[in-house]
Amino acid sequence: MENKRKLTTVLVSGNFNVLHPGHLRLLRFAKESGDYLIVAVESDRIAEGAAHVPEDLRIEGIKSNSWVNETILLEEPVGDLIKRLQPDVVIKGKEHQDKFN
């Protein structure tokens, strides 16, 4: 009998302006929380001035990480992306701990 286990999909989103050790800890934790890690990098338009590094360079930084299976450019509200992708797990950074999820 063939064992067909469903992969647990994890989603992380953010602007990832200047990739730093905190981002790396977040990505490692996210990968440990599932099998397939999708990282949504906020577009320059969505980041609204929070990102000083252009989106293509921020995406390149995330794609270079071996924990990340897929990188996408986030050009819609993150709630809409979650509804569309329906990941099993959504990981938010510490800066979101006091916000409604």
Identify the residue ranges that each predicted region occupies.
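Nucleotidyltransferase catalytic core that binds NTPs
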Residues: 1-101
